[in-house]
Amino acid sequence: IMEFYDSIGVPRDVGSRPTTDHYAIRGLLSVHWLFDDDHDDAYFAGEDMSDPAMPGFAYYGNANGYDIWENQYYIPMGFSYDYYITRSEYNALNEGSENAIGDRELAMLRAIVIEDDRVQYYEGILEHLPESMRSFTENGYLQDCLDRRERSCSSFTYTNTGFTAQIDSTQEQIIFFSVPYEAGWSAAVNGEPVAIEKVNVGFMAVVVPEGDSVTIEFTYRTPGLALGFGITLVSLALLVAYLMLMNRVRPRPA
């Protein structure tokens, strides 16, 4: 995830706090609600609440000392793409800075970023983003959000070991989840194990077949946990055996 933030010019430390200039992050990461403290003068939409600092947000109400804003272009977790760009093409785009959005961030709502050596794998699943579609604007971002929402999961549920999602898939396609890619994750589609792809500079995706109510399940297990548990059991068994042996060979008092 640090690689992702670095790639779009957002400083990454103990907590990630992208400025409102980076509005496209909110779309990519499926942000639905924003809570703005009504006790300070750092207004999200100005004192008269008429000019939201990010496009697509509308005032919803106030509760417990917070003004609540809804992202009307919210994309549910788990959505698909029609197009891709390679990591090299992504790196060639404008990065942006801490207080300015760049083309890289906007591009990820229009085309999924795949590693250069995976292009052949996606033949027949994704199309290469045409040059004519490589102009990125605020209005274009809003339309891209609507397009992604059109092909998003119908349900997404966290579990004790990860999450599950369902989608009505009209064709074989790749489904993106804004969950950091790391060792320990495994995935299954309709109960069958599938490979997890690293996409969008550090997030996860899987390819799903055509079908109604396709079920996607991600499970996380701490890497090395089973091995560590096994080593602990073996060590304990050796300790018990050693103590029993020492007890047998210890000379008895006369």
Where are these regions (language model features)?
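Extracytoplasmic
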Residues: 1-147, 170, 180, 192
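Active-site-proximal, structured, solvent-exposed surfaces of multi-pass membrane proteins
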Residues: 119-120, 124-254
